[in-house]
Amino acid sequence: MAAAEAPSSALAGEEGARRAARLRRRALAERRWSLVTIVLGLAIVVGVPVASYVVPLLRDVQPNAQDLTATLQHPSVAHPFGTDNVGRDVLARVFAATPLDYQVGFATTLASLMIGVVLGAVAGYFGGALDTIIMRLVDVMIAFPFLVFVLAFIAVFGAGLTGIYVGLTVFGWAFFARVTRAEMLGVRERQYIAAARTLGLSTRRILVVHALPNVLRPNLVIAMATLVWNILTLATLSFLGVGVQPPQAEWGSIVADGQTYLLSDWWLPTLPGLVIVLVGVGFSLIGDGIADRFGYDFRLTV
């Protein structure tokens, strides 16, 4: 009997070893693919602003310069994205709008991240009534219609960037707070936090030095999604005429200027729109790569 069991045990051991080897190879392949995804996303989101800086140095074309003798030109070497109804070079306007869109996206996302992480960490670490108050506020913010919320701030501050900055920041922090609080509930029970308390470290030092660094990873993924969302929101508001005001170029307003000619001159709204999509895909790839690398089971969509 013992002799019969020995071969079966050996076979089971070999099968287990092969399964473990397959899992290791799969994990290694996923980590490599996540790195490729992150690099590709970075190439896109860095390449667009770099091009917006370098290309105007090579092309002496002003974004607001009008040429009524060259209106509605097809894409060409001289005008890769064509010209609009008053003869302005569309590519020059897209590149002129790039710094503004990135600035709004990064500034509002960073502000939301800082506010949300602090409030979420406080709620998760201390719990009790403070946790209840903060999380009920988060529930209210998330339940409120996003675009209506931002439009309310624009109504208060007037059309332009001020209301957009405030609206995007005030609304966006709730998502970071919810994720941070969920992570903090687990982190506060870890042994290194208990050891820090035993050593008599202050609560602020425990939070800043030991707890917060361990809740930031999932927030990086949320930050990529928020960046995409904020850039798209700015473009949407400018498309509707309540965002960036003329003559300042903005991706959404450029698409709005070309929508009238969609059937006859399709490139006017389509090519700037593709730039918006490309940037959104770039940030989403970075977020997906981070999620894969650290094992988070959610994905970003544009």
Predicted regions and their residues:
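Transmembrane alpha-helix signature in integral membrane proteins
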Residues: 90-125, 279
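Transmembrane alpha-helices
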Residues: 99-115, 204-236, 283
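Transmembrane alpha-helical segments of polytopic membrane transport and secretion proteins
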Residues: 1-46, 285-302
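Glycine-rich helix-loop "coupling/hinge" segments at transmembrane-helix boundaries
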Residues: 153-157, 184, 233-276, 299-302
